[in-house]
Each structure stands twice: as structure tokens, then as C-alpha cells.
Amino acid sequence: MRKYINYLLVLFLVSSCTSDTEAEPQALETSTTTSSTTTSSTTTTVQKIDEDIVVDEFGIELLEVSPEMKQQFDELIAFVEKRTGLTYSEYPKFNLYTLEGYRDYSAASYLDDFEKEYEEGEWERAVLSENMWGLPNASPEKMKELIVEFQRCASAGSYNLLDQILRVPIKRNQTKLNLWEQSVIVHELVHSLQGQIIDLSEWYTTMKDSDDFMNYPGRRSIMEAQADLVQAYWESNLDSYDRQRMASERPNFRCSVSLPEYFYIPFDLYYDFGARLGKQIHSNGRMEALNEALYK
């Protein structure tokens, strides 16, 4: 199962399995003006099937970015730069999917990595060994099915530190991003910026090659805390009507998959402990302290 945990290290997720979190205005600075899988060997390829349909490396449809969406991205990028005090070195890469397409990508990406990482019989031996220790009680095939389904429903958006692409599901046939989609994109844009300030791909590859991930949890926790904080800043600019509208725009996520408890330890670490650690750092030195903790 360790290889699956390593796969999760590559993905920076906005969880869809947890309850909605409200922004905390009391923890925000007063000036909130806005200017507007481990897949280590996967090559990201965008293919054009015909004049109207573009697909990703797994043949899953990518939605077209309208001029209005591009302007919204520009505004959200400017907001992230303003709130973090940092600047993108290049325009962030992103893929937009339908919700079902995003879920298909999440499953396909995991299965692609699964085929590359596990030798014949290795997965079966790993699961049966854990069965002997009283951990999962499912068969190897059932456990694989559960993990694939978990990958499909576990996130509302993601950033992959290896190919440096943020991926977000949006509604089809709309010219502008709704508030829910913008909020998710803000979170992932922070990770995209972090990936440009730090060479996260090289950082991860070095850890994987040396089989030493000791430095990962601390930095990842702070990275999630910073992304959550900037997302909360953005949501704090919404009035009560817009907050209600954003809540109504959230897709009807269903994630009833139940995995062994230890599968959730990384999520608790990054999204619970990380948030508390980030708030402590931020309360002592504001965003500059978070940047220093991450980048120095």
C-alpha cells in the first residue's frame, strides 16, 4: 500500500468528501482587494480528435476555455499573486473537464500509474499480507476497485506536481466560471504558484529515488494551509447572497467509499494538522512567514 500513499504525494487535492468550510474573516488581513497520480513517467499529451473536441492523454474530453473564462483566470491569478506577495514565472497550465470527465481522468491516471508501479503479483501479495495483520479484509481485486472509486470521488480539483497541470471540473456550455469553480481554481492556482517557486517535480523525484519522504509531510502541510488561506481570502469578498449561490453551485458529490482507516492518515495530516500549523505561522508573521517556511 505504500506505493498508493506515494501516489497521493503527487496530487494536491481540494477534497469533495469533507463538509464545506466557511472562510474565517477574523483570521484575515484587513486589505482584501482583488484586482479583478503517482504518474512519474506519464507524458501529458493533448490530442485534437476533430475540429470541436480536444482530449487529454487518456482520450478524455477537455472543455474549451472561453474568452470570458480566460479573463477570469487572469483575475484569479492576479488575486493569488497579490495575496501571497509572489509572482508566477509563467502562465499556469490547466485542463478543464466535465465532472464525469474529471472523475474518469482521476481513475485513469491512477490505473496508469498502477500498471507501471506494480510488478505481476506484487499487489496481491501486499493486500494479502495486510489481511494477515488485520488491516483490510477485502480481496486484492476488491481493494483495487475501492481505491479506483475513491480516486473518482475524492476531490473537486487537483494539481499534479510532476506535470504541473491543475485540473478542475466545470459545467459544460457555460461562458463564465461560476463561484464554486473559481474558489476551487484559486486553491489550485496557489499550488501551481508554489510549484513554480519550488521545483516540486525535482523535489519529489529526489525523494522517490532515495526512498526518503521525511521532508514531505511538513512542507506539504504548509502548502495546503497557504492554499486554504488564500482561498478563504477570496471567499471573504463574497456577500451573503454570493455565498448562498456558491453553495448551490457545488456539484452533488457522492463519495461513500470506505477504505481502511490508515488510508486517511495523509489527508488528516495535510488538511487538519496543516491548517492548524499554517494558522499558527500566519498569526505570528502573516503571509511573509508562510512564504519563508515554504521557500527558505
Where are these regions (language model features)?
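C-terminal motif of bacterial Sec signal peptides marking the signal peptidase cleavage site
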Residues: 13-16
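Bacterial signal peptide processing site
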Residues: 18-20
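Extracellular mucin-like PTS domains
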Residues: 27-46
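Post-HExxH zinc-binding segment in Zn-dependent metallohydrolases
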Residues: 76, 196-249
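Catalytic zinc-binding patch centered on the HExxH motif and its immediate surroundings
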Residues: 102-124, 141-166
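Short pre-active-site segment immediately N-terminal to the catalytic Zn-binding motif
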Residues: 153, 166-186, 218
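Catalytic glutamate of the conserved HExxH
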Residues: 184, 188-196
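Pan-zinc metallopeptidase signature
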Residues: 258-296
